[in-house]
Amino acid sequence: MKLKYLVSAMALVVLSSGTAMAKTPDMGSFHADMGSCQSCHAKPIKVTDSETHENAQCKSCHGEYAELANDKLQFDPHNSHLGDINCTSCHKGHEEPKFYCNECHSFDIKPMPFSDAKKKKSWDDGWDQDKIQKAIAAGPSETTQVLVVGAGSAGFNASLAAKKAGANVILVDKAPFSGGNSMISAGGMNAVGTKQQTAHGVEDKVEWFIEDAMKGGRQQNDIKLVTILAEQSADGVQWLESLGANLDDLKRSGGARVDRTHRPHGGKSSGPEIIDTLRKAAKEQGIDTRLNSRVVKLVVNDDHSVVGAVVHGKHTGYYMIGAKSVVLATGGYGMNKEMIAYYRPTMKDMTSSNNITATGDGVLMAKEIGASMTDIDWVQAHPTVGKDSRILISETVRGVGAVMVNKDGNRFISELTTRDKASDAILKQPGQFAWIIFDNQLYKKAKMVRGYDHLEMLYKGDTVEQLAKSTGMKVADLAKTVSDYNGYVASGKDTAFGRADMPLNMTQSPYYAVKVAPGIHHTMGGVAINTTASVLDLQSKPIDGLFAAGEVTGGVHGYNRLGGNAIADTVVFGRIAGDNAAKHALDK
């Protein structure tokens, strides 16, 4: 029988009474007092970097997250969009716990149990160059055919593709949980020529996908990469579905001429659905996935071929993994303030919607060995990040019918324009913010909107007039905006701003609004790759043994990325990178 009474007590402590139950200085001591060190650790005690055994012990006593979920709590860490992550992501054995939710949110809650425990310096705070060089001099402590760095969508897809091609794979990530930026993606995956489009009667063409992406990127994209993205996008959706993902729903993202963004039915966010699917597939296929394992240096031989990497493990320290192929899938640098200030100084004070792991590690390591960069100084702002927060208000909300207005309640641009144009337009409005407004129809249709309500981000009014008063908008202006927009929906033509897709009117009470402003969302550039996802050197020649996919790369999206193309990028080029990395390794 699981310790459900203890679980309930601890859940209440987390969100109410602080450290009331903690009579010992830390969680490890608490469990030792109840039994022994072996209550958590294997005998003899040897903790892996992923803390796999310890997490299994947690669940053997306390139950899986589904059992721990408590719908009586306003915010339930055990039932969140992060999915089934490691217990030790937040609960620490012999040190102060860490409430990871507040890395993005600002929940006003009491301390977690054992929060009076000693706070230790982060295990990966800084890189010890002497130890890195010693690890290289000692040579590989183990070898694999393919080493994948970064366990987001690109990394998981690369690992699964390499495994399918017959290679042995090790997948590492510096975070205590997998997912990366993909885990917090809300929109979906763009694809052309899918069964979903056929079922919904949507006519689309590969040429249209390419044209839309190139136009959105201001013609600065590498058209060869965009063509591959378009041509292989439908197969990417089918691949995810074969692994168990649900992508039945369709909507239109900004810059697309038709509905081509595939997402889960019921209004769920796409990121958790895709990452949970990939996590399960990697586990089922026996891929060696290591968390708390930060790659700190790529290792090259005298011929300048990549032959492995130095890893800094939370418990194992610095060691080298020898690999015939390495895939970089480390994401962008949207959370690296120094890199943002250097490459895009005008955005250095902006908030970011990114996962805290998006610190540009892969870019820096690739530059160190002579990799070429492309579009590295282009950074995309998402127009609708919750004002004074890091919570992304998904483009899906506008895509399924919401309207954007300024502080007075007046529209100022088509809601489905590209992100760069929408961001620029918002920054030209009084106060440099906007309101996203919608009615109860959209509230019921888009599940993520109910999440914003749960986070107390929504303003509400039983009438349009009440909504205007609660937000400070001008009553007459907002009333006219809603009336005019409903007329456009009825006629099928937006004569004010030319919005092509208007799936919902605003006629059903109550009415809602959420305050938004632009925030750093996607770093457009990174390492240069070719059509096989090989990383290029300064002479535009492939670096032997090094591949890359996802936001760590540049060239796919040009100056500005369209919503839905990032997940497509991670799936399509993640698979290409993994497949070619495996072929390279197996041929050596």
Curated annotation (Swiss-Prot):
It is found in: Periplasm. GO terms for molecular function: FMN binding; metal ion binding; oxidoreductase activity. Flavocytochrome that catalyzes the reduction of fumarate to succinate in vitro. Is essentially unidirectional, catalyzing only fumarate reduction. In vitro, can use the artificial electron donor methyl viologen. May be involved in an alternative route for electron transport to Fe(3+). PANTHER family: FAD-DEPENDENT OXIDOREDUCTASE 2 FAD BINDING DOMAIN-CONTAINING PROTEIN (PTHR43400:SF7), FUMARATE REDUCTASE (PTHR43400). Transmembrane segments: none annotated. GO terms for cellular component: periplasmic space. Keywords: Electron transport, FAD, Flavoprotein, Heme, Iron, Metal-binding, Oxidoreductase, Periplasm, Signal, Transport. Its EC number is 1.3.2.-. Fumarate binds at G187, S394, E395, H521, R561, G564. Homodimer. This is Probable fumarate reductase Ifc3. Heme c 3 binds at H78, C87, C90, H91. Its cofactor is FAD; heme c. Residues 135-588 are annotated as: Flavoprotein-like. Residues 1-22 form the signal peptide. Heme c 4 binds at H81, C101, C104, H105. The gene is ifcA.
